[in-house]
Amino acid sequence: MQFSSAVVLSAVAGSALAAYSNSTVTDIQTTVVTITSCEENKCHETEVTTGVTTVTEVDTTYTTYCPLSTTEAPAPSTATDVSTTVVTITSCEEDKCHETAVTTGVTTVTEGTTIYTTYCPLPSTEAPGPAPSTAEESKPAESSPVPTTAAESSPAKTTAAESSPAQETTPKTVAAESSSAETTAPAVSTAEAGAAANAVPVAAGLLALAALF
């Protein structure tokens, strides 16, 4: 009798435990929960999408919020196809401030239903460098001096030719044969020698004239 009563008690306890056991719902739905966070006397609300789990115990229903069973929280993602925007950066130094417009990329990070926008440099866009200039474009044209002939650079020959008609053919012949300044020196010397030869009879004539007086 005692054995049978023990069996009945264990059966009743087992049925009671079965009636009060927690059940896990696998087909859960989603809902939006507002979370309020406070820091340094400042509070802000954030909406988070989460799952709803219902636990039934007799006629009382408890609802708890938990993450989705197979859905992980989305990690911050960086978009590869970024667009560009212009951001104004203000720099101050020695009580002087100036603004600079900088073109930068826009990356959108989505977490739940909140969208955070951060500014970051463009991934791999570089400004094209200036094209190298050729030597012909940057170097000025060099002017070469025009060679001058002996007849143009030595006017002394013409003077010698005009002053001494007897020696007129000699300087012209030398000027026609040579076009360099080195060969013109003898022509000038020849003209001077001719002038000196003419000066001897003139001096002799002056002495003879002086002897008459």
UniProtKB/Swiss-Prot annotation:
Post-translational events: N- and O-glycosylated.
GPI-anchor amidated glycine lipid attachment residues: 194
Propeptide cleavage-removed residue intervals: 195-213
Composition bias, Polar residues: 145-172
Highest taxon of the lineage: Eukaryota
Keyword GTP-binding: no
Glycosylation sites: 22
Observed effect of gene inactivation: Leads to an altered cell wall structure with a less electron dense inner layer of the cell wall, and a disorganized outer layer.
Induction record: Induced during cell well regeneration, by fluconazole, and in high iron conditions. Expression is also induced by TBF1 and repressed by SSK1, and CYR1 or RAS1.
UniProt region (Disordered), positions on chain: 120-194
Family from the record: Belongs to the HWP1 family.
Protein name (record): Cell wall protein PGA62
Originating organism: Candida albicans (strain SC5314 / ATCC MYA-2876) (Yeast)
Phylogenetic classification of the source organism: Eukaryota, Fungi, Dikarya, Ascomycota, Saccharomycotina
